[in-house]
Curated annotation (Swiss-Prot):
Statement: the UniProt record of this protein carries the keyword Ubl conjugation: no
Coiled coil: none
Assembly information from the UniProt record: Part of the 30S ribosomal subunit. Contacts proteins S3 and S10.
Keywords: Ribonucleoprotein, Ribosomal protein, RNA-binding, rRNA-binding
Protein name: Small ribosomal subunit protein uS14A
Record-stated family: Belongs to the universal ribosomal protein uS14 family.
Regions of compositional bias (Polar residues) in chain numbering: 33-45
GO annotations of cellular component type: peptidoglycan-based cell wall; small ribosomal subunit
SUPFAM superfamilies cross-referenced by the UniProt entry: Glucocorticoid receptor-like (DNA-binding domain) (SSF57716)
Regions crossing the membrane: none
Gene: rpsN
One annotated GO molecular function: structural constituent of ribosome
Region Disordered: start-end pairs: 28-57
Function: Binds 16S rRNA, required for the assembly of 30S particles and may also be responsible for determining the conformation of the 16S rRNA at the A site.
Length: 101
């Protein structure tokens, strides 16, 4: 079980990312566009740099949806490898079977 503070911090970051997503994409489009003027591009770069660090989606951490474990995250399930194994053995994940060949 991860610390509650780490889970809450990641949730707060996710909310910040969602809040600034449209602004970030607009600024990044201006920066990437070859047709934008150099002064317009530099203005967009400064505006992007002024945004909070937590507005960047790179700072989000994939965590287990049940207990918040940060490592061994399986994107398909939204759970850690430990939790997937436990739930699969208990039969709580439909369609998941233990491999046998």
């Amino acid at each position: 079980m991860a610390k509650k503070s780490k889970i809450v911090k990641n949730q707060r970051r996710a909310a910040t990312v969602a809040r600034y997503a449209s602004r970030r994409t607009a600024l990044k489009d201006i920066i990437r566009s070859p047709s934008s003027a150099p002064e317009q591009r530099s203005t967009a770069q400064r505006a992007l740099a002024r945004q909070p660090r937590d507005a960047s989606p790179v700072r989000l951490r994939n965590r287990d949806a049940i207990d918040g474990r940060p490592r061994g995250h399986l994107r398909k399930f939204g759970l850690s490898r430990v939790r997937v194994r436990q739930l699969a053995h208990d039969g709580h994940l439909p369609g998941v079977r233990k491999a046998s060949w």
